[in-house]
Amino acid sequence: KMKVYSMNMGDEILEIAIGDYQVVNESDWTNYIKGVLWAFEKKEMVLPFGMDLLLFGDLPSGAGLSCSASLEVLIGFIVRDLYGFDVTNVDLALMGQQAEHEFCGVNCGIMDQFAVAMGKKDHAILLNTKTLGYEYIPITLSGVKLIIANSNKKHKLGESKYNERREECETALEEISQAIGIHALCDLDEKTWNLYQATVKDDDRKRRVKHAVTENARTKQAAAALKNGELKIFGELMKASHQSLSEDYEVTGDEMDALTEAAWQQDGVLG
């Protein structure tokens, strides 16, 4: 068995029976641990013995800073290194996503787990989530500070608009693909979207696709700006990204909107 204690959660010492992984309570944070152990077992990597695990983290829970993905990837690293399993960092990211999808019942993307598993100091990652092809982009801040602020709005992916937005995008993709042979919204560029947006019948779905298409373009522009050290352009793209998330994708919320708008009013803020 595995004994787990979290200094953050303040619970008693919790026990997980090796090989008997069940979701007893959907809000139980140990489901993320169980899910990763379950994902190893699905790959026929069974833990030969248990362990005692003491956990502490400095990410605020539920702040949209990938604390669940961080826990999943951490458990993956521990299990791989302790038991000598042959899995790559990308494998661990995918297993974390699989744990959320199939064990925890949360429909999530791969970005969080990939960033945690593959992160590199002083670099951003340009990731193609369709192919998992990636490129490290050096970040040279040159006197500019990157500030991470907590809006204090609690975020749970399972309770967020993620699943609803994903369904809207998938429905829109079905509509568009009847006119042109695409398999994902990332196959659309802005010019093609402008030509075929009438194939999407619902105005809300149109705005969701507009966000996806323009965000892809902004991401590529942002990578180029970082490579060239053009931080002002990068900041402008970040601002445009938030505005699109707020107005077209509608996932930011009043707290995040207020925080970003207050930041934009400060002298020296690039985005």
Predicted segment positions?
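Short, well-structured alpha-helical segments that form the helix of a local strand-helix-strand
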Residues: T88-E100, I233-S241
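Flexible interhelical turns and helix-capping residues at alpha-helix boundaries
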Residues: E44, C104-N107, L245, Y249
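ATP-binding N-lobe of GHMP and related small-molecule kinases
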Residues: K1-A69, V73-N89, L94-M95, C108, ...
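Hydrophobic side chains within alpha-helical segments
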Residues: A115-V116, R218
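Short, internal active-site loops enriched in acidic
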Residues: F56-G62, H101, E190-W193
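Short amphipathic alpha-helical interaction patches enriched in hydrophobic/aromatic residues
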Residues: V79-Y83, E100, H242-L245, Y249
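C-terminal nucleotide
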Residues: M2-E26, H123-G271
